[in-house]
Structures are given as structure tokens and as C-alpha cells.
Amino acid sequence: MSNTASLKKEYAERIAPALKNQFQYSSTMQIPVLKKIVINQGLGMAVADKKIIEVAINELTAITGQKAVATVSRKDIANFKLRKKMPIGVMVTLRRERMYEFLEKLVRVALPRIRDFKGIESKFDGRGNYTLGIQEQIIFPEINIDSITKILGMNITFVTSAPTDEEGYALLKEFGLPFKNSKKD
């Protein structure tokens, strides 16, 4: 809990005032905040093997500290042998304390464990949100390399209240996300 308190405290004491000065906000309510982090795993191979979903739920629950839910297909697709409401993925939405804990773990522990890591791309969605793709779940310390059966990737989406990509980039940069082509001021 001390990490969570420190990250929230850091936002209130250092990050928010820095963003207010940088973008010349007239009100503190205009300062962008991190609303939620959504972690998603698309598991197309779950159509053939149902146990993959259970394994993925357990792994994502261990990584995030919050129960993961299976996502289901919305329609039939015969070419993929897919039926409506079949589980084809796993997701978790993190808010408040767990969100800050996961962000801390991602920045300080998981990302540095990626092989040949040179930083993450700084491409946003046009509305201040950022999605990061990770190829292997083994970068997280909660995953035991010996016990995994299949290496699975995941998408991590950072949803912010920032209206523009520039403001979203500044917020996530202040939180410590290591962007590749970071602009030095």
C-alpha cells in the first residue's frame, strides 16, 4: 500500500503542478488524470482448447491482483469454427489503488525485463489514450516460467482524461513510462 500512496502522492505533489504549468491550465480540474488501465488478451486458440482460458484467467489475476473475466464472441464465424458466446479472450479493468500498483510494477519491474528493451512507442489514439502491446506474459514476476504452457501476449490500454495526445503523452511520461523518442525540454 505504501507504493500506491507514494504514486498518488507523487501525482498530487509533483505531476499535477508540472502539467498545470506546462499546459497553462486555468483550473485544476483541467489537469489530465489516469482514469483506468485495461489489460486484454485475445486468445483465438481457445476455440480448440478450452483450458487456455482458465490458465489465462489465473495468470492475469496473479499479475493484476484482480479477478479477470472471460470475453465472449458476439457472432458466429464458420471459417474460424467460432460460435456465438464462446470464450475467446480475457480482460481486466483496473481503477484506483490497483491501477497505481499495476502501473508501478509495469514501469519499475516488468518493462525492464523485456529482452533488448529500448523504450516503448509514443503513438496515441488521437484522444489522449495509449495502448501498449506486450508479446510475453513472462516479464511479470508473478508468472513462473516453468509452469507456463503457452506464451501469451496482451494489450495494456491507459485511459486518460487528456483531450489531446500531447497532454496524454506528458501525463504518462511523468508517471515514468519509458518512451523511445522522448522529447527533452
Swiss-Prot record:
GO terms for biological process: translation. The keyword tRNA-binding applies. Keywords: Ribonucleoprotein, Ribosomal protein, RNA-binding, rRNA-binding, tRNA-binding. Transmembrane segments: none annotated. GO terms for molecular function: rRNA binding; structural constituent of ribosome; tRNA binding. One of its GO terms (cellular component) is ribonucleoprotein complex. Part of the 50S ribosomal subunit; part of the 5S rRNA/L5/L18/L25 subcomplex. Contacts the 5S rRNA and the P site tRNA. Forms a bridge to the 30S subunit in the 70S ribosome. Belongs to the universal ribosomal protein uL5 family. This is one of the proteins that bind and probably mediate the attachment of the 5S RNA into the large ribosomal subunit, where it forms part of the central protuberance. In the 70S ribosome it contacts protein S13 of the 30S subunit (bridge B1b), connecting the 2 subunits; this bridge is implicated in subunit movement. Contacts the P site tRNA; the 5S rRNA and some of its associated proteins might help stabilize positioning of ribosome-bound tRNAs. This is Large ribosomal subunit protein uL5. The lineage of its organism: Bacteria, Pseudomonadati, Bacteroidota, Bacteroidia, Bacteroidales.
